[in-house]
Structures are given as C-alpha cells and as structure tokens.
Amino acid sequence: AERTAAPALTLQPTRLHTLLAHGVDQLAASAACELGWEIVAPLPFGRALNVAINAQPQSHADGMALLAGGEASDPGVQARANGIRHWSDRARLFQLADRDAEIAVLFEATLASPEDAVRARRFHAAAGSQAALAGKIMVEQSDLLIGVWDNGSRDGVGGTGHTIVRALEIGTPVLLLEPARPEHRSILSSTESLAGWQ
C-alpha cells in the first residue's frame, strides 16, 4: 500500500487584538511589537473620532481640534492622542465607523455643554455601545483574553468588566490580573468563576 505524506503543519502568526486605549492596551501593543507579533485593532469608531474620544479632551476646542486631525492644547490630552495615533499606524485596523456622524454630534454637544447630564448620557450610551461592539469583535477573534481589572463594575457597557463577562459567556478563557496586586492572577473559564475572584 502506498503511503501519502501528512501535510506539514504551519504555525500561524501570533496576533494581539487590542482596542489601543491609553494605558494597558498600549503597553500590551508595545510588548507585542517587540515580540514581532501582528497587532489587530477593532476600533469602536473611525480613526479620527477614536482619537478624539479616547484622548479624553476636557475642552470643546481640544475635542474639535483632535476630531479634525489637529493637536490639542492640553499636554496630557495630546500625549494620549499621540499614543493612539502611534499604535493605530502600526496596527491592522477594523474601524466601526458606521455611526461616526451621529456620535460625533453627541461628542461635540457634550463638550460644548459639559453640565448637561442628558447630553452626556446620550453620548456615553452611544460610545459605550460602540466600545462593546469592538470588544465583542476582539473577544470573538481571541483564543485568550488578558484582562487587567480591579473587579469594579461589570455594568458599564463596553468597559473592561463587561468585556470580560462577554468573553466568559462565549467560552473564551480569561487571564485576569488585578492592577494593584499583579501577582494575584487567575485563569477563568466561566462567569461563575468571577464570583470568587477578589
């Protein structure tokens, strides 16, 4: 009997899926880049709106400048914008920009009237919904989710806790790290396992 050779196994490239937010997301992107991994970023918005929102401007002028692709006058806001732009240039982006026009109007209105709680709620609901969608895409493409979380709210749509719960619900294991105690880590495989994690 004639034997046929088994096909050679090929390793697929290691990818980091991240939303590129300021902080842990960008630290992870830096480490992944050093290891030669591909960086994939499902952004909750188109690139310009993503930079403008996630740089967290406090003034209308800074928000509008960033939205137009310019610079913010606040150094902290500009530093966050630079970080997001830097990693966006190095990542393969999937931009969820279909609601950008609507959300940009809400973003501008919130910055123009920061004391208006109704406008703020509308903006945060729309932005949170987009962040949740980007998080869902990220989780669905991941073999393991690494969550750096203080075990705070799970109710904030699109937030870290929400994304961790979503991953566990669809069967993606989560390596959970507590920022105040990095030596305290657990690998979780179900939402029930969150109850005992503290």
What are the residue ranges of the model-derived segments?
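Acidic/glycine-enriched connector segments
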Residues: 1-197
